[in-house]
Swiss-Prot record:
It comes from Afipia carboxidovorans (strain ATCC 49405 / DSM 1227 / KCTC 32145 / OM5). Transmembrane segments: none annotated. The keyword Iron applies. It holds the Pfam family Pep_deformylase. This is Peptide deformylase. Binds 1 Fe(2+) ion.
Length: 171
């Protein structure tokens, strides 16, 4: 297991649409393990493979409620089957947009289909934080960031800040 580098905006790879996982191999399992280690180290509650520069449709998530508990989950080739008309607002953050948080409106619940590391296909209803997180991470797989839901003014301001920081870091 290894902690991988999390890429951040303005890195253009974050806008890439990820490819489906064709077969669950030892490499896919190792990637999931690395992603958990990276996510816990950050720390975060969800991570898409593209955030560690691997363009595969794989998500790791841990929404454990209490300190010291763990509820690791892997979602391979996840897809949203249906969305509620009800809207929920959560303050979202992203490991690829460090230390920036903003309220985002999303469907309050979704039905999602995904495969686990054993190759089993599941369908599950997601509500609350789980619904927000799975939508946020699936967006990553499609090259969409949570700042895309903000006004153009806010989005441009965030991109300008991170682009400037990236240029300064490169010097």
């Amino acid at each position: 297991m290894a902690i991988r580098e999390i890429i951040s905006i303005p890195d253009k790879r974050l806008r890439r649409v990820s490819e489906p996982v064709e077969k669950i191999t030892s490499e896919v399992r190792a990637l999931a393990e690395d992603m958990f280690e990276t996510m816990y180290d950050a720390p975060g509650i969800g991570l898409a493979a593209i955030q560690v520069a691997v363009p595969l449709r794989l998500i790791t998530m841990d929404l454990a409620k209490k300190e010291g508990e763990s509820a690791p989950r892997v979602f391979i080739n996840p897809e949203i089957l249906s969305k509620s008309e009800d809207i929920a607002v959560y303050e979202e953050g992203c490991l690829s947009i460090p230390e920036y948080y903003e309220e985002v409106e999303r469907p309050a619940s979704v039905r999602v289909r995904f495969m686990d590391l054993e190759g089993e296909v599941h369908e599950e209803d997601a509500e609350g934080l789980f619904a927000t997180c799975i939508q946020h991470e699936i967006d990553h797989l499609n090259g969409v960031l949570f700042i895309d839901y903000l006004s153009k003014l806010k989005r441009d301001r965030v991109m300008k800040k991170f682009t400037k920081a990236a240029k300064l870091a490169a010097k």
